[in-house]
Amino acid sequence: MARTKQTARKSTGGKAPRKQLASKAARKSAPVSGGVKKPHRYKPGTVALREIRRFQKSTELLIRKLPFQRLVREIAQDFKSDLRFQSSAIGALQEAVEAYLVSLFEDTNLCAIHAKRVTIQKKDIQLARRLRGERS
């Protein structure tokens, strides 16, 4: 809606303003406590929605590379010691893992919404995996 210039209008009567109670007047006239400004806080959910939009726009990896690499090497130790990995192999593993997790969380969110909830729970992940046929 376009902004329009507002002109002063003559009062046409109406109700007269009531007198303020003593406590209300005292509250309004009291000075601000030491001029300390409260830190700004967004409403619950605002930051979460902003993060969702930010991460949906981006294409970079969400898991840090070195911790992921350590995890892969730790898991590989159980199968064979002294395994060596090309950096491109670890990169491909990380891409695949993140794509799988994002897809799983999308399905999990749909399960939570189907149950008329907005919070995902363990049972939503279990249901999503069961529907995919990953776990009987």
UniProtKB/Swiss-Prot annotation:
PTM characteristics: Phosphorylated to form H3S10ph. H3S10ph promotes subsequent H3K14ac formation and is required for transcriptional activation through TBP recruitment to the promoters. Mono-, di- and trimethylated by the COMPASS complex to form H3K4me1/2/3. H3K4me activates gene expression by regulating transcription elongation and plays a role in telomere length maintenance. H3K4me enrichment correlates with transcription levels, and occurs in a 5' to 3' gradient with H3K4me3 enrichment at the 5'-end of genes, shifting to H3K4me2 and then H3K4me1. Methylated by SET2 to form H3K36me. H3K36me represses gene expression. Methylated by DOT1 to form H3K79me. H3K79me is required for association of SIR proteins with telomeric regions and for telomeric silencing.
Principal location class: nucleus
Membrane among keywords: no
Superkingdom field: Eukaryota
Stored Gene3D superfamilies: Histone, subunit A (1.10.20.10)
N6-methyllysine modifications at: K5, K10, K19, K24, K28, K37, K80
Residue ranges of the TM segments: none
Modified sites of kind N6,N6-dimethyllysine: K5, K15, K28, K37, K80
Annotated positions of the N6,N6,N6-trimethyllysine modification: K5, K28, K37, K80
Pfam families the UniProt entry points to: Histone (PF00125)
Keywords recorded for this protein, A-Z: Acetylation, Chromosome, DNA-binding, Methylation, Nucleosome core, Nucleus, Phosphoprotein
PROSITE patterns from the UniProt entry: HISTONE_H3_1 (PS00322), HISTONE_H3_2 (PS00959)
One term of GO molecular function: protein heterodimerization activity
PANTHER family named in the record: HISTONE H3 (PTHR11426)
UniProt subunit comment: The nucleosome is a histone octamer containing two molecules each of H2A, H2B, H3 and H4 assembled in one H3-H4 heterotetramer and two H2A-H2B heterodimers. The octamer wraps approximately 147 bp of DNA.
Family: Belongs to the histone H3 family.
Chain's role: Core component of nucleosome. Nucleosomes wrap and compact DNA into chromatin, limiting DNA accessibility to the cellular machineries which require DNA as a template. Histones thereby play a central role in transcription regulation, DNA repair, DNA replication and chromosomal stability. DNA accessibility is regulated via a complex set of post-translational modifications of histones, also called histone code, and nucleosome remodeling.
Protein name as annotated: Histone H3.3
Provenance organism: Scheffersomyces stipitis (strain ATCC 58785 / CBS 6054 / NBRC 10063 / NRRL Y-11545) (Yeast)
Gene for this chain: HHT3
